[in-house]
């Protein structure tokens, strides 16, 4: 599972990480009234504890949200005048051959948190470690285009992977085929560096605590009190330290969103995100608060364990997909501030200059139109599936549990809504399982569930990012589903240089996913209702920016 957004994710995670920045708005450290400079700091929160700082093993957005600030990638996705642009990270310049299959990255002068220089070999080691089947990297599918990747997965030497250190400051990456979005892929956590000596020194402890991790980014992980708080401190050894204005970041880990709301009101947080109607109105009325609403590249969705005795059946999965009234759910649970999903690929994604969702159309509407044309309801498909499985014709005999990754009041209210929804549409008595993120994630990875509900945030602006999650070799979303035709279409699309052909290949793949196999149930394209104290500047407004806290300022704090 994934960022970053990754890997990976409870519904409310879309409102928990503040973060990415743009390249403008830095005001510096402002002097107080007496003329003395005041160090800038930022107080924020997330709703679950990160699982690890090991970039080869993280999959959830909580972990990747922190890693994005303590690590530096080859390049980052920035914002300039409201548009995406690739900006330097460890690599200050880069170029490719004419075919787009050999990329050369020229590293600048950056250091690790122990003072040693970041080298091209650190990237070689990191990519090899993530590609190694023994590591179990949940995001290794981002390495699929790299030459030798398939051979390594089949047991070949790690040296087979197409990554090479020409010298300490020059990294060469060879691809099996040209990938139009390769630089965007390089912004992801799997392309971050790792120091071999540190990984080997700490073994299984690597990434589990601040002292068992090394950093090359704008911040260091100063403290990590699990399930309580994380403290980040500006790192002077960072290559772009002069541009980092906020000295200290405190990330409170709050299991209950209502605690965040009261902390914001008390001045203990500089940011809060919410979809709760009463709190939105309260925060909108505050004179000390700026409101930012963005439609992200995220999707909230239900998904099925296709190895389950019941949900192995496509008609039963279709019944559950059709039973959800997305517009009603949006109004009841989000106050109408999100958008009903129209596909798996969000409306924020494009292929070149063409918005993918506009090209592919509303596949959820197409599902209902097909059912209407055939005179079928959601319950009809459920009964058809039950007949195919020899389960009789009484939905109340079905034993079904819906798993949610949260235990607070919002999740319990949402669980009640789901029970009513599925009882009305399908006539079933649905059970709800509530658990904290760590337990929920563990159950998914072991296949110990029937239906789950999560949110997923795309790393970069190409449909491959989210469609590849369902490829056979990818266990990011543990559905157990495999389809050779789907795999072939997604792979062909990734390397297709003609935009029109690429669009059509992605559409065909998404059609299999949503209109033939019903493996996943896209429910909402959520908006982010973000509230910042008005002295906070430099936060991002675009979905795929990866700047982190380094471009933010709080210099106007009184």
Functional labels for PLM-detected ranges:
Residues 45-98, 214:
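N-terminal lobe/hinge region of extracytoplasmic solute-binding protein
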Residues 202, 237-282:
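Ligand-site clamp/hinge motif
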């Amino acid at each position: 599972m994934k960022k970053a957004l990754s890997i990976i994710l409870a519904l409310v995670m879309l409102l928990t990480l503040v973060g990415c920045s743009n390249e403008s708005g830095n005001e510096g450290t402002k002097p107080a009234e007496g003329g003395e400079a005041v160090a800038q700091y930022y107080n924020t929160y997330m709703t679950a504890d990160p699982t690890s700082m090991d970039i080869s093993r993280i999959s959830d957005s909580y972990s990747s949200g922190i890693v994005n600030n303590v690590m530096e990638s080859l390049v980052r996705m920035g914002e300039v005048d409201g548009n995406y642009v690739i900006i330097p990270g460890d690599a200050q310049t880069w170029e490719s051959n004419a075919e787009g299959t050999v990329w050369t990255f020229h590293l600048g002068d950056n250091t690790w948190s122990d003072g040693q220089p970041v080298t091209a070999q650190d990237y070689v080691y990191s990519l090899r470690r993530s590609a190694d089947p023994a590591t179990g990297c949940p995001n290794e599918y981002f390495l699929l285009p790299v030459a030798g990747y398939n051979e390594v997965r089949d047991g070949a030497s790690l040296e087979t992977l197409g990554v090479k250190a020409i010298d300490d400051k020059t990294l060469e990456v060879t691809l099996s085929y040209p990938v139009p979005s390769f630089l965007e892929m390089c912004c992801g956590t799997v392309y971050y560096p790792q120091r071999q000596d540190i990984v080997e020194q700490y073994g299984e402890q690597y990434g589990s605590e601040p002292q068992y991790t090394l950093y090359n980014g704008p911040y260091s992980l100063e403290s990590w009190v699990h399930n309580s708080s994380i403290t980040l401190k500006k790192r002077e050894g960072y290559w772009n330290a002069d541009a980092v204005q906020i000295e200290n970041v405190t990330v409170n880990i709050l299991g209950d969103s209502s605690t965040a709301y009261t902390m914001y009101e008390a001045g203990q947080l500089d940011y809060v995100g919410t979809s709760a109607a009463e709190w939105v109105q309260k925060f909108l009325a505050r004179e000390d608060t700026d409101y930012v609403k963005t439609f992200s590249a995220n999707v909230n969705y239900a998904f099925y364990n296709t190895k389950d005795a019941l949900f192995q059946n496509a008609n039963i999965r279709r019944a559950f997909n059709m039973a959800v009234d997305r517009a009603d759910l949006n109004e009841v649970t989000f106050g109408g501030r999100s958008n009903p999903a129209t596909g798996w690929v969000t409306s924020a994604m494009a292929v070149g200059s063409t918005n993918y969702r506009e090209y592919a159309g509303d596949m959820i509407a197409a599902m209902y139109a097909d059912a209407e044309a055939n005179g079928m309801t959601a319950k009809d498909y459920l009964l058809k599936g039950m007949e195919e499985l020899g389960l009789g014709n009484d939905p109340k005999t079905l034993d079904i549990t819906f798993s949610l990754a949260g235990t607070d009041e919002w999740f319990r209210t949402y669980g009640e809504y789901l029970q009513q929804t599925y009882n009305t549409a399908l006539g079933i008595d649905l059970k709800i399982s509530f658990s904290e993120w760590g337990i929920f994630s563990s159950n998914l990875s072991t296949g110990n569930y029937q239906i789950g509900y999560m949110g997923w945030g795309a790393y970069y602006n190409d449909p491959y990012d989210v469609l590849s999650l369902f490829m056979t070799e990818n266990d990011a979303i543990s559905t157990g589903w495999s389809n050779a035709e789907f795999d072939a279409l997604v792979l062909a699309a990734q390397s297709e240089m003609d935009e029109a052909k690429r669009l059509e290949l992605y559409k065909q793949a998404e059609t299999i996913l949503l209109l033939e196999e019903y493996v996943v149930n896209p429910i909402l394209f959520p908006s982010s209702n973000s509230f910042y104290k008005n002295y906070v500047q430099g936060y991002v407004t675009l979905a795929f920016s990866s700047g982190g806290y380094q471009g933010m300022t709080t210099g106007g704090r009184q």
